[in-house]
């Protein structure tokens, strides 16, 4: 199995999602980075593409798929790939948009696009998600990947820096996920060799700059 990991491009109000002010749209920079990422990946042949069920994560995915020469791949949305504290964030966003006395004209679209599979916001905890809980999500994702998909598959994961770092740490057999945190629209690539994973590249951002 070969696994390529990347992250979505920068999204609007990226620095204050915990306040419920974030939008599901990519920023201009995020769109540009996603387009350059798509150009870098256009010749790749993927069997499966996994992404989070947030709107902006799916936007980067759609831009990548649109640019692929070989489009015979399956896109799978997976809540395990959400960013840390995502449910708390989206609950606050929904409350802010619903209770606002002057609703934003795009409120309904934003709410419906926060989740691709469902527009139902799940019950959330009032406390921050722990690193152990994020680790469990990463382990659950990898367990499903290894047990439900062919070992000969080439897989693209469009996650976020935190969840990707936990996934990479698991592949590398490391307990220190912080050393594997990556940049938006970067590329990290791993190939299975027997019982271990060979790192082919990590946090590569060369494709984001004009050559």
What does each model-found stretch correspond to?
Residues 51-52, 136, 157-159:
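Short beta-strand scaffold positions
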Residues 3, 151-162:
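Generic beta-sheet signal
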Residues 43-45, 145-154:
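Glycine-rich phosphate-binding loop signature in dinucleotide/nucleotide-binding domains
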Residues 37-112, 182, 197:
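Phosphate-coordination/substrate-recognition cap region in phosphate-metabolizing enzymes
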Residues 84-102, 151-153, 165-211:
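Acidic, low-complexity terminal tails and accessory targeting/binding regions
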Residues 102-133:
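Short glycine/proline- and acidic residue-enriched helix-loop micro-motifs
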Residues 1-46, 54-55, 62, 70, ...:
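An N-terminal RHG(E/S)-centered segment typical of histidine phosphatases
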Residues 20-29, 122-132, 179:
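Active-site metal-coordination segments of metallo-dependent hydrolases
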